[in-house]
Every structure is written in structure tokens, then in C-alpha cells.
Amino acid sequence: MAILAVAIFLPSQLRLQHRDSAESTRTELTSGIVQWIGIMITDPGFTNIYLRGIEADSSLDKEEQHRFNVFMVSYFLRIQQLWDYDNKSADALTYANIMLGTGPGVLNWYRDMGRFVFKPGFVEYVDELIEEE
């Protein structure tokens, strides 16, 4: 009888533990994106670079363009991690669409650079999001 009770109890505990672990992972990934955005908000010098970058401002010098590129790669790598974890994630969709909709510089960056640094499946995902706009 005790074995039967354990056999019934254990799977439900494992499901709960898996669900808690999945939620914790998702929360950690999304908080990483929020923290990364916080850099843009708290660093006035970078905010200027970011705002000019998303508008495709050609006056960005080499160092500024590099900083914008690194920010974009890092941001989209975090979205790719969310997508890798759950490719049906509403969070991945939300954060990708937020950035893709901010300005022509983001789309230029993605077409010229971004699509060449990410996994093929994620590139297809982002390409589909861009086509939907």
C-alpha cells in the first residue's frame, strides 16, 4: 500500500517541481532582458547612441556603431535564449516585437548584421515577425 501511495504522490510532485523550475528559468531570462534595457536608460551617453542607432543615424562614429551593435546582439541573444527555452513563448514574441518596432535602424542592423550571428531557426522566427509587420 505504501508503494502505491508513493507511486501516486511522486509524479505529481515531479510535475510541480518541473513547473516551478520552468517558471524560474523564464523569469530569470526575462529579468535579464529588463536589466539590459536598464543600461540604456541609466547611461545618458549610451542612450544617445541607442536613440541615434534605432533611427539609422549615419553620424554614428565607429565606436558608437560598435556599441550599438554589441547592445543589439546582446539583446537579441537574450531573446534567442527565451525562444530556445520555449519557441512558443509570448515573452520572446513581445520582446522581439518591441525592439523590431522601435525604428528603421533596428531593421537595418538585423538585415546587415543580426541575422548572420544567430541560430538558423531563430533567424527564421525573426524573419517571420518582420514579414508580419
Language-model features and meaning:
Residues 2-9:
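Alpha-helical transmembrane segments of integral membrane proteins
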Residues 12-133:
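Amphipathic alpha-helical "stem/stalk" segments
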